[in-house]
Amino acid sequence: MNYSIGKILPTDTASLSAIDQLLIDEGIRRDRHLDYTCAMFDDEMNIIATGSCYNNTLRCLTVSHEHQGEGLMNQIVTHLINVQMEQGNNHLFLYTKYCSAKFFSSLGFQEIVRIPNQIVFMENKRNGFQHYLTKLQSAIKKTQSLSPKIAALVMNCNPFTLGHQYLIEKAAAENDLVHLFMLSEDCSFFPYEVRKKLIQAGIAHLSNVVLHDSDSYIISQATFPSYFQKDEDAVIQSHIAIDLQIFTRIAATLGIQRRYVGDEPFSHVTQIYNQAMQQKLPEHGIECIIVNRKTIDGRAISASNVRQAIQQKNWRLIKSLVPQSTFDFLMSDKATPIIKKIQQSKEVTHY
């Protein structure tokens, strides 16, 4: 049979409702983060298969159990890959159930890491992650040989605050070399290029800190796919397990012995993440150092506090929370669209 595949618009509530039911029937749910969705229709215009994208990832792929074995998933994936290629995304990623990894391998996807009996993280570029590790290593080869104490931090910096600066300065003072990994995904209020420039300005005085892009290998909890997880805590645990496997391979490549993280007693996600790092990282010879956050007037400095202050137009408070370089940017015309977006948003804090 010849089935048709078409794009589903966000306004097509009937089709989206049918997709939701199909996903539920097959044991998954629609992910919170999608920017393209397609569906396959039978001769009576019933939706029998679906798939979606978010940035350069494939998500929410499923075929009705009544039509499995007909090669429909292959057609859905091919359609999504073509959509991604048209958008200039040649390096694609997906997270799939453990039992489905073999199928995606047959379509050219390579395993990066896996959580046994749960999730497999895959990419369509052969040895892509190994090439990323090689790129990291070549960038610091000369410096690393002279650095017996090597540490790392992973940050989003949305935007870069005095809290971030304090944590980086502490790591820089206590180690010979510090690798700072900045989340590359562009899904924050402050775009990737802006965050990178603010970080560079904020660490310019630290000669032993090397800034790296995370590429698509390290992503935030906010955009980790949740569609085949039973609840939010399961999503968090899966993200942590994948993320720490990625990080420990990076650490082994770069000789990283310590990872610095900021404490955040009011964040459920951060508490779970920090506990997992304290347990898992030492198994790989990496010390997890949790640092009490820098405070002002007894309150911890965080990027979410800065965003809230921007929303409230409290510039005096903002000036006390960020380095001068960040504040200067916020006062510039280039920041106007970002500030407007934050001020118009209902929610500017993280989970």
Located regions from the model:
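Structural motif
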Residues: 34, 54, 115-116
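Nucleotidyltransferase catalytic core that binds NTPs
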Residues: 96, 101-109, 114-351
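Short amphipathic alpha-helix that is part of the acyltransferase structural core
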Residues: 1-30, 41, 46
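Conserved acetyl-CoA pyrophosphate-binding loop and the N-cap/start of the following alpha-helix
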Residues: 67, 71-79, 163
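Conserved beta-strand in the GNAT
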Residues: 39, 45-62
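Conserved GNAT acetyl-CoA-binding A-motif
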Residues: 84-97
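Short coil/loop residues immediately preceding or within conserved phosphate-binding loops
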Residues: 35, 58, 148
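A generic structural motif
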Residues: 40-44, 175-178
